[in-house]
Amino acid sequence: MGKYFGTDGVRGEANVELTPELAFKLGRFGGYVLSQHEPDRPRVFVARDTRISGELLESALVAGLLSVGIEVYKLGVLATPGVSYLVRTEQASAGVMISASHNPALDNGIKFFGGDGFKLADEQEAEIEALLDAKEDDLPRPSAQGLGMVVDYPEGLRKYEKFLVSTGSDLEGMKIAIDAANGAASYSARQVFLDLNADITVIGEEPDGLNINDGVGSTHPEQLQNLVKGSDFVIGLAFDGDSDRLIAVDENGEIVDGDKIMYIIGKYLSEKGRLSKNTIVTTVMSNLGFHKALDRENINKKITAVGDRYVVEEMRRSGYNLGGEQSGHVIIMDYNTTGDGQLTAIQLTKVMKETGKTLSELANEVTIYPQKLVNIYVKNDMKNKAMEVPMIAQIIEKMEAEMAGNGRILVRPSGTEPLLRVMAEAPSTEEVNYYVDTIAKVVKTEIGI
């Protein structure tokens, strides 16, 4: 991560931290860096989610791109994975998504994609950051025919929808509830699932600029659960603001998270001989029950740090085609290069349709262990050295010995705050509380503030 670019682009409170001035500079400097790697005039696709600040930041960003001669294709409101897909398939130079994903409406973000549909290379982000920190803007200022032009490209949305539909099965006879989070999926999910012949009901489909992720979507699935519970819906599908993640709800109203979704799709692909190296890539936060289910099915797993960025990096490096996070980011590399909530939903319903099983039957093959996570404020200079403290290392070793393989402890520092995160999983809530509380007490005594 750099000074401006985090693991998911540049983010902040819109018009306060992520200002139009910064958006203009990101467009201008980002466009210039791209132009240095392109023999011809670069063509950049730009999209946004439904936040009220989206058009403000889009206007500034596009102005910056145009000022260095970039040809801009404006996609309007579109899911983040839609940008990734279109950049790659339409041979654009790059893509930019204006979104803060599952964050509330006051936040926004700007994320760049390279021409291959993946996040912009770290080296290029570093070049942009160097220009942002320069005392003077000495970049060329073309005029007349040297300026960039804007092309409105609303047909990009329909191309993305057709792609999604092409990956699925006919869902005739399936009654599906959808929560579009008042976000980007509000513009596509209904059409996609109608094209798949599903019988659908959609909530969270009335964005007003301020209600994105507000009591709806993958981080607030309660409304969807209540809709599905006691009805004849066979599944509920909850997306987040930019539709790059999915949380599902089974026919009984129970949550089916990213771990269970990866297991269901992974097992299906494995049985078809289509799971690359018979391996799923996941993070250290995936539940122990998920790991045990994979072991039972003889499916391998590769573990990364928290963040879909690290999952994608490992998938690219080692040639895996399925990975993701408990939070609902699922990357199916056979189809797209980033987490795609609607694509994941289509693959999940395809498994249901082809196996004839209910979602609860498929999901209950994974027994999720009770999990507890606590955040402990610690001395900032010690958060990365906690395991070097003898008393902390000893208590963790003691707790792991007591678990005897039937539980898991994870202690990791926050990347942005003076926090140590202590997580445990075990067969019962009582055991989880015991393990976490015991470790937390020692951490607070030794390095707490």
Curated annotation (Swiss-Prot):
The EC class name is isomerase
SUPFAM superfamilies xref list: Phosphoglucomutase, C-terminal domain, Phosphoglucomutase, first 3 domains
How would you describe the post-translational modification of this protein?
A: Activated by phosphorylation.
Query: Which residues does this entry mark as bearing Phosphoserine?
Result: S101
For whether the record's keyword set contains Magnesium, the answer is: yes
Q: Which Pfam families match?
A: PGM_PMM_I (PF02878), PGM_PMM_II (PF02879), PGM_PMM_III (PF02880), PGM_PMM_IV (PF00408)
According to the record, cofactor stoichiometry and binding are noted as:
Binds 1 Mg(2+) ion per subunit.
Q: Name one GO cellular component term.
A: cytosol
Q: Which reaction does it catalyse?
A: alpha-D-glucosamine 1-phosphate = D-glucosamine 6-phosphate
Q: What EC number(s) are associated with this protein in UniProt?
A: 5.4.2.10
Q: Which domain of life is it from?
A: Bacteria
UniProt: Mg(2+) binding residues: S101, D240, D242, D244
Cystine connections: none
Give the keywords, sorted.
Isomerase, Magnesium, Metal-binding, Phosphoprotein
Q: Give the protein family.
A: Belongs to the phosphohexose mutase family.
Name the job this protein performs: Catalyzes the conversion of glucosamine-6-phosphate to glucosamine-1-phosphate.
**Can you say what this protein is called?**
Phosphoglucosamine mutase
Query: Gene name on record?
Result: glmM
